[in-house]
């Protein structure tokens, strides 16, 4: 994901360059699931820069914790980031149980701060309803970025994403085999 962290690839002003950077990342992960079918999970992190602003960050982190928190705490940051948000205020801001309803509120609140939800946060939330979040820590060895651990169960990836990033790879392998069979490779 570090290849996508670069701000110039996240901007809608970058046009197709930004679209393909993230799309290529997902295609590569889809290929891994085909080449290594015993893989059951993707484990990684979402990165936010300190320049993002603590108010917007805290809104996003609260939303992720409310809807995707790993209650078993199988992984925890050694030194967790302590959000500065007012818990009572955020509970009132996000009163709904439905992710979609609270997501609309999150998007509006973050935009009101002059920011956007980071593209990878959106992308991960749209991969699977069973995504798990493990907490956030500051990486003092990489520009003091804030990294939130996540886990995606491959079997739970939405069919639409599976079709786009896994099945397209399977189809390309089938085509390659057809070309080889007819000596066209």
Roles of regions detected by a PLM:
Residues 85-185:
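Intrinsically disordered, low-complexity, positively biased terminal segments
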